[in-house]
From Swiss-Prot:
UniProt protein name: DNA ligase
InterPro entries xrefs: BRCT_dom (IPR001357), BRCT_dom_sf (IPR036420), DisA/LigA_HHH (IPR041663), DNA_ligase (IPR001679), DNA_ligase_CS (IPR033136), DNAligase_adenylation (IPR013839), DNAligase_N (IPR013840), Hlx-hairpin-Hlx_DNA-bd_motif (IPR003583)
Organism, as annotated: Francisella tularensis subsp. novicida (strain U112)
Gene Ontology MF term list: DNA binding; DNA ligase (NAD+) activity; metal ion binding
A GO CC annotation given for this chain: cytosol
Amino acid sequence: MTPNEFFSIKYHILAKAELKAYIDKLADYLSQQSYLYHTLDKPIISDSDYDKLFRLLQDLVNDNPQFKPINSVLDRVGGEVLAEFETIKHKKKMTSLANVFSLEELRDFYDKIEYDIELECEPKMDGLAISIFYKNGKFDYAVTRGDGIQGEKVSENVKTIRNVPLKLNTSNPPEELEVRGEIILDKQSFLSLNEYMQTHENKTFANPRNAAAGSIRMLDSKVVAKRPLKLYSYGIGYFSKDFVHPETQFELMQLLQSFGFTISDNMFLAKNFSEVEEYHHKMSHQRADLAYDIDGLVFKVNNIKLQDIIGYTARGPKWAVAYKFPAEEVESEVLNVEFQVGRTGAITPVARLKPVAVGGVIVSNATLHNINEIKRKDIRVGDRVIVRRAGDVIPEVVKSLPQYRKSDAQMVEMPTNCPVCDSAIENVNDQAIYRCTGGWHCQAQTTERLKHFVSRKAMDIDKLGAKLIEQLVAANLIKYPADIYKLNFDQLTGLERMGAKSSQNVLDSIKKSKTPSLARFIFAIGIKDIGEVSSDVLANHFGSLESFRDAKFEELIEINDIGEIMANNIVSFWHDSLNIKIVEELLAIGIKIQNPVKVEHAYNESFTGKTVVITGSFENYGRTELTQLLKSIGAKVTSSVSKKTDMVICGDNAGSKLTKAQELGVEVILEDNLKDLL
């Protein structure tokens, strides 16, 4: 049918069965047009006709909700807001590829296979990995990679992506099929999204990858539906026995394209290593001109049977490898050096640069780490410098180019007083770190401490973001954590960009945070060097805030994961009258700390009461899953190896923890033996 034929039908006089058939036919037609437009880039109807037909379908379903078609284009507009994402297990482990960083290492991979082979070559998209499960050809659910064993179910968000098939384009779909791919934002869409975000929300994303990942993890799919995300498929995971698997990887990708998935235009079949080198050379030079960001190339053995023979490690397939591009480096000029103050008072020099594009992002600031690094690299204001950015790493100044140095270039000196509060700056034990001594009296430290206090792993006041904290501090509405709980509706609505609904959401979020676990509360109050894991250890050991507050140094250093420096910091924290006042104000204003419940663990001869460290990756367990399993049988799982450690459970690619365990004579358990002990 054509658009005009759909419009010509007098649907308002149709019988119920006829109306349902008309709605189904219209939904199928729109799905086909969406596929032609978003996947094949070959539309056959105008945007105007598509929009009119889409509105017609919406109106018909609104008037006749009992006839709403399953997995139609209507599902792309988003649904109800979720409270949280469900965690579900992958039917087939979602592994990672081994990395190589040079052509020599890529040649080693090729030679180890010991066959004359073809390699299927493709760009390595820099986005969010996703797995989409289809049942009898219809979209069932979508899940993120997570830890490879399990991930977050993000079905409603993924359904909004225009080029994700809601039905497979085949008359004979397999009973079950899991399709895997990368969700991305192309460069132009990213720039447009950031312009919108800057105008409407006064914030932007750092890069397209963060934008894609952040969008998919939003709880409101209606917002996600407005984001120009795109899926590129790169393979399959689990499939039922009735799936007719092609003989080669290249043919598999063509099959997925016929099902309705978008695949890369830059896929290539290399018949020998010489062609692999040619592809590498071509893509390295075309990288900057691609519509989307890539951070490397992927090479897969083309023959599927040969893939099965070559096999897998616990981490991933031995028949595929990812070539990672070297960190991108460009030249820029240091316009100025400013000093930022962090949550603990640490002073960090930051170079203000002449804006330059690097790694897909416009960079105008770069870290200089500390004053010792500045002196070692001899970086001066006015210098031309090399700036590097790799992945999500904060851009850094690698080195200066003294051959271009101007005569008026200025050396950088560490200030003696805080640039924010004018308190003295101290250097303890002649280390590289200098700190402002102002504490809560320094507005910069106050702001960062309050950001930490409300953060997701602390008090989890999710509607109270970093920008709003900055506004509240600048307006003198909050100075200490308890002030957050004194905020009222009028104060919030009086701030820029804060309407009635947003203000009420903030107040609801604050109220919801009043019953934190003891571990969250310890983490939130910001004791120096006490992170999330240490807070959990301390909460479980002491059981209450009162016991923790009264802890002596001698008791603290006996606790696994708590060393002398951390113990000293804890004792010093509770000897500071201002810290005690801050905590008491929080308790007085209604914070009800939930103490950990003592759980009776199942007894296990090998693990109950033992201190265990996990290192490496495992074939049959995710790290989170294994940690929870060990805790359930009474083991204490810690993050570092020490003399107090009873055993180290070791998977593939174990690093320094295994070395330290061997040096200390700590028992090492391999995954092969773990199942018997459990």
